[in-house]
């Protein structure tokens, strides 16, 4: 089999995006669009991927590190000029080269594989990936002869009235014989209104040499959708989201309302888990089997065990064990580690906290920089006071501890196993095992005092 190469065009600034972020780095369902393209290419049997970078080169290289080689296009002088920058990496090599735009995040590996196969079957020097759309305005048209053989690509502005009625368009993805490509690129002219070197001109050059030029027509236009502005970005995200959600449902996940559920592309969800409307699952989140993620929940870069119920809560960069109840309105901040059979109730916040098996944090609690043992019950309104204005300190609570309501644990402090903290206490010293910690003023009732004040009258 011939060697395979790929060139990804990612040098454009994307002025129509009106953004400080370079165009190809705009995310589609949690991943920069150029990374979608390169990841799909990487599943093919490709010997080398070369990404042409320009604007934002360092950022693009950072995102694609280890996935591609890079060549910089110092001046953006057109698509043919961009591909020509890969000459030091690819020129003279036997094989075929895919050319794909980095702003087409919906392109699939199966389509590119079919293009490569068709190119080989037709023994072509160039094969154009085409599709048919109802309104081809603005796209280059594929001109064929009476036998269906490709004659040329005509840009919309240069097309005759008859040619403009053609609905088969150039998607901007190509497969070339590698040597023929770089030989033809040397002959591309910039004699046009824009003064740029256009890749479709390679097709004309090869046709003039009587080389075979083919066109592989794919069924779906959406794969070729190029993102040039925020409207197209939203459309690409919507189409990608539908693809992601459909895949999860095929794999045994219930999405109660798929159109109102956001799931990033790298999220993994176990079978028989139910995702209710209004949920956002981001980053590298992993959710186990038989979970329920209720409406209004957001989970990012976290690992959720099995049989977990999350009610209208936020979980970020945390780990949750099996059979855990969370929410409503809980907030698990980064580095929270919630063990099995834990209850995290309403308006509970954790941060850099380990919560041991069977422990209950029922409501209105803050545990930051804390290590909590097994079977602990923390009463309403209790706080691990971890910050003195300059430094963070740690609170350690042993197993089988009871912390009464409205207790303040002033870190650094340690509460031993089976200890009891009286409600309303402000604990500043360690509490030994099996001890009662109580730190509050003795109640004193001043008889008739309120009567003398006459309740402020």
Swiss-Prot record:
Mg(2+) binds at residues 103, 228. Pathway: Nucleotide-sugar biosynthesis; UDP-N-acetyl-alpha-D-glucosamine biosynthesis; N-acetyl-alpha-D-glucosamine 1-phosphate from alpha-D-glucosamine 6-phosphate (route II): step 2/2; Nucleotide-sugar biosynthesis; UDP-N-acetyl-alpha-D-glucosamine biosynthesis; UDP-N-acetyl-alpha-D-glucosamine from N-acetyl-alpha-D-glucosamine 1-phosphate: step 1/1; Bacterial outer membrane biogenesis; LPS lipid A biosynthesis. Residues 231-251 are annotated as: Linker. It is found in: Cytoplasm. Residues 1-230 are annotated as: Pyrophosphorylase. GO terms for biological process: cell morphogenesis; cell wall organization; lipid A biosynthetic process; peptidoglycan biosynthetic process; regulation of cell shape; UDP-N-acetylglucosamine biosynthetic process. Residues 252-457 are annotated as: N-acetyltransferase. Its EC number is 2.7.7.23, 2.3.1.157. Its cofactor is Mg(2+). Binds 1 Mg(2+) ion per subunit. It is an enzyme of class 2 (transferase). InterPro entries: Bifunctional_GlmU, GlmU-like, GlmU_C_LbH, Hexapep, Hexapep_transf_CS, NTP_transferase_dom, Nucleotide-diphossugar_trans, Trimer_LpxA-like_sf. The active site is at 363 (proton acceptor). GO terms for cellular component: cytoplasm; membrane. It catalyses: alpha-D-glucosamine 1-phosphate + acetyl-CoA = N-acetyl-alpha-D-glucosamine 1-phosphate + CoA + H(+); N-acetyl-alpha-D-glucosamine 1-phosphate + UTP + H(+) = UDP-N-acetyl-alpha-D-glucosamine + diphosphate. Homotrimer. This is Bifunctional protein GlmU. It comes from Listeria welshimeri serovar 6b (strain ATCC 35897 / DSM 20650 / CCUG 15529 / CIP 8149 / NCTC 11857 / SLCC 5334 / V8). The lineage of its organism: Bacteria, Bacillati, Bacillota, Bacilli, Bacillales.
């Amino acid at each position: 089999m011939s060697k395979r190469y790929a060139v990804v065009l990612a040098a454009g600034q994307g002025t129509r995006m009106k953004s400080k972020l370079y165009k190809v780095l705009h995310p589609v369902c949690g991943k920069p669009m150029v990374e979608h393209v390169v990841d799909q290419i990487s599943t093919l049997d490709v010997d080398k991927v070369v990404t042409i970078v320009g604007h934002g080169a360092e950022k693009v290289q950072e995102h694609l590190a280890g996935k591609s080689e890079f060549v910089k296009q110092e001046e953006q002088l057109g698509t043919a000029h961009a591909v020509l920058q890969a000459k030091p990496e690819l020129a003279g090599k036997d094989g075929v080269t895919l050319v794909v735009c980095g702003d087409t995040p919906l392109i699939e590996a199966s389509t590119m594989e079919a293009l490569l196969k068709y190119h080989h079957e037709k023994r072509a020097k160039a094969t154009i990936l085409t599709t048919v759309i109802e309104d081809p305005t603005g796209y280059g048209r594929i001109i064929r002869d009476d036998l269906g053989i490709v004659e040329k690509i005509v840009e919309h502005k240069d097309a005759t009235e008859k040619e403009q009625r053609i609905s088969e368009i150039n998607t901007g993805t190509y497969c070339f014989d590698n040597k023929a490509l770089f030989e033809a690129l040397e002959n591309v002219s910039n004699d046009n209104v824009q003064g740029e070197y256009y890749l479709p001109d390679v097709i004309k050059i090869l046709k003039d040499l009587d080389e075979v030029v083919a066109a592989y027509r794919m069924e779906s236009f959406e794969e070729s959708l190029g993102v040039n502005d925020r409207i197209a970005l939203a459309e690409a995200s919507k189409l990608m989201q539908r693809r992601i959600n459909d895949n999860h449902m095929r794999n045994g996940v219930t999405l109660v309302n798929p159109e109102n559920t956001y799931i990033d592309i790298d999220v993994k969800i176990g079978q028989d888990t139910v995702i209710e409307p209004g949920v956002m699952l981001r980053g590298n989140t992993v959710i186990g089997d038989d979970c329920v993620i209720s409406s209004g929940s957001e989970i990012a870069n976290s690992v959720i065990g099995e049989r977990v119920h999350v009610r209208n809560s936020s979980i970020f960069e945390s780990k949750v064990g099996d059979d855990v109840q969370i929410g409503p309105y809980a907030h698990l901040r980064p580095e929270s580690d919630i063990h099995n059979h834990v209850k995290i109730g309403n308006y509970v916040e954790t941060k850099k906290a380990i919560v041991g098996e069977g422990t209950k944090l029922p409501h209105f609690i803050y545990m930051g920089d804390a290590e909590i043992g097994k079977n602990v019950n923390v009463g309403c309104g209790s706080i691990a006071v971890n910050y003195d204005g300059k430094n963070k300190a740690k609170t350690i609570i042993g197993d089988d501890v009871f912390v009464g309501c409205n207790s303040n644990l002033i870190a650094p402090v340690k509460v031993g196993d089976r200890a009891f903290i009286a409600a309303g206490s402000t604990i500043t010293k360690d509490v030994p095992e099996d001890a009662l910690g109580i730190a509050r003023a003795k109640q004193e009732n001043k008889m008739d005092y309120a009567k003398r004040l006459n309740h402020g009258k």
